[in-house]
Design a protein with these regions (language model features):
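Ferredoxin-reductase
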Residues: 1-87, 142-144
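FNR/FR-type flavoprotein reductase catalytic core
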Residues: 72-157
Length: 157
């Protein structure tokens, strides 16, 4: 659990590598915009169990894996919100084809609302870090200014 984004959204960061292994292998190779399944272990009174999918909001250029979610009153989200630093989480994936296009002569136009901005955070951070020659145009709708997520990333484009 890293920080609160907006009003009811939390971002969770996890180590990208298993430092206990001799080769320090990367545990998840993904493309900006993809999602993965996160298993947080025992969740009581939740018929859906301990596995949920989340868009990876971090960029592959960052040294951590991050996902962001609205914290609601479900058993899963309650358990997620009290995870201790260093907690083990199983990850399966990545999956999905909602990624930045490769034709940089055409602008990338993003439309998002609220928590739907998460794949764009990943793509914008990646494009910025890699200095890709792509023009990014973003339209992001929120209830008010306090609910804008990832303000620093959005200001850069």
């Amino acid at each position: 659990k890293d920080k609160v984004e907006g009003t009811d959204v939390m971002s969770f960061k996890f180590s990208k590598q298993n430092d206990q292994l001799e080769n320090k292998i990367t545990l998840l190779d993904y493309t900006a915009g993809q999602f993965a399944f996160f298993d947080i272990g025992e969740v009581y009174n939740d018929p859906k169990g301990p596995l949920r999918h989340f868009t990876i909001s971090s960029s592959p250029t960052e040294n951590f894996i991050m996902f962001s979610t609205r914290i609601r009153d479900s058993p899963y989200k309650k358990r997620l919100s009290i995870l201790e630093k260093g907690a083990k989480v199983k990850v399966r994936g990545p999956e999905g084809e909602f990624v930045l296009h490769q034709d940089y002569s055409k602008p990338a136009v993003f439309l998002s609302g609220g928590i739907g901005v998460t794949p764009f955070r990943s793509m914008i951070k990646y494009a910025t870090d890699m200095q890709l020659p792509v023009k990014i145009i973003m339209f992001d709708s929120n209830r008010n200014r306090n609910n804008i997520l990832f303000k620093k990333i959005q200001v850069k484009i």
